[in-house]
Amino acid sequence: LTPKSILEFLNKDGNILLALSGKASTSSAVSSLLLEIDIHLSNDRSSVVVDHFNYDTVSAAEKHDVLLLQRPGPLRPDVKAFFDGEGILALPRVAPQTLGSDSALVAPILRAPATAYAYNPKEEMPSAEDIEGTGSQLNVVSAMQARNSARFTVLGSVEALEDQWFSASVKAPGGKKTPTVNREFAKQLTAWTFKETGVLKVGKIEHHLATEGEVATEDLNPKIYRIKNETVRNSDSQSHACSITNCSV
């Protein structure tokens, strides 16, 4: 697959879930593809997110590269939350993403905590110059909804989808062991990406000239209107017409 063929798939209303890993360098082809939609990886494409305060003490006692995060809420109070809920997510070896400022079509789903930072783990003792980004400027999960409503979601931790993390028990520093909710979050993420949620499903549509009183059946849905006609349009919908950043509650 080439970036061109994947973009052509998106242009034909295809939806994509891309999972990355900080365990290995991301290919230049994937990096180039993400640049096309204004999602940026680290310069060396090998960075991983670590957090010395929000990590799993069971599996990452030394490297602190298994993030423990709450599920995300809505971006704004007037936006529907598709990924919220109770419980802790375990996200091993996250490949961080940052978003460009030129596109209103991309949005963060899950940001890194304020105490997190990204660096190349090949550097044993990272200096300030080695740090690729910090805090909420780093995205763990990002998404793009194109103008044709095609959806592209980037998950920074493919390991988070493995069976072992669906049924794992994790423990934050100073906390108690708790089961992960990776399975539930994966269902939410795939449901949004592949348009099982957040899609307007229009049923019955009626339109007619604006008049007082009852409208006769034969006056519904006329084929022609004049320029200055006032009209009324009614439709039945089953859901919201939603992107991540634009969905009324």
Descriptions of predicted regions:
Residues L1-V249:
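Short, surface-exposed patches at the edges or C-terminal ends of soluble domains, predominantly
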